[in-house]
Amino acid sequence: MAFTCSDIFKIILAIILPPLGVFLERGCGADLLINILLTILGYIPGIIHALYIILKY
């Protein structure tokens, strides 16, 4: 699987602000709400979920 420039940009954003990376990848939906909740509960789970979403789709 090759990474594009936009994927790398989304990964950097996911490390800084996880919900923003998920929003750019999947839009406003259940994945975004889950990521916001995970980020509120703990920053690291939010990052892990964001990276999973970006790398999966």
Swiss-Prot record:
<keyword id="KW-1133">Transmembrane helix</keyword>
<keyword id="KW-0812">Transmembrane</keyword>
<feature type="transmembrane region" description="Helical">
    <location>
        <begin position="34"/>
        <end position="54"/>
    </location>
</feature>
<dbReference type="InterPro" id="IPR000612">
    <property type="entry name" value="PMP3"/>
</dbReference>
<comment type="function">
    <text>Plays a role in the regulation of membrane potential. Could mediate a proton leak.</text>
</comment>
<keyword id="KW-1003">Cell membrane</keyword>
<feature type="transmembrane region" description="Helical">
    <location>
        <begin position="3"/>
        <end position="23"/>
    </location>
</feature>
<dbReference type="GO" id="GO:0005886">
    <property type="term" value="C:plasma membrane"/>
</dbReference>
<comment type="similarity">
    <text>Belongs to the UPF0057 (PMP3) family.</text>
</comment>
<protein>
    <recommendedName>
        <fullName>Plasma membrane proteolipid 3</fullName>
    </recommendedName>
</protein>
<keyword id="KW-0472">Membrane</keyword>
<dbReference type="Pfam" id="PF01679">
    <property type="entry name" value="Pmp3"/>
</dbReference>
